[in-house]
Amino acid sequence: MNRTEAREKATALVAQMTIEEAASQLLHSSPAIPRLGIPAYDWWSEALHGVARAGTATCYPQAIGLGATFDRELLQKIAGSIALEARAKYNAYSRLGDRTRYKGVTMWSPNINIFRDPRWGRGQETYGEDPVLTASLGCAFVEGLQTKRDGYLTTAACAKHFAVHSGPEALRHSFD
């Protein structure tokens, strides 16, 4: 199926949905729509440094450590390896009818937030404070996750936390 055929098929499928059915698909945990042959799917899968939340997998260093390498090619290879493991797990879990959280191929990765304040508790999930480095490594990670095999994406990347994730949450950077 080519891109045009896929778009036409998706458009026709959505046109058959009720408003309630379409709205139900907007959550990370999308329920099945049996009358249309749509299985349940949970869009929430993470791949910042591997896919071990759904069982055994290779665990790579946190993003801050990967950022310290300044190595775009390395990050692309790591992400490609993560994508292969994610696809293999997805295929295995799907055969069992298990499409719950962390078992999909839609990856909420990479984190392209800029690490602005060392007091923020999730800085290790970022590539650091340099926007140019973050852009370069983030693109490489997406390219690796979205490596095509047999004409299809291995996984689909969703770069996260671009806008204001490290603030300004109330009281995030203060103490009593």
Question: What are the roles of these predicted feature ranges?
Answer:
Residues 1-176:
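Glycoside hydrolase catalytic-domain context in secreted enzymes
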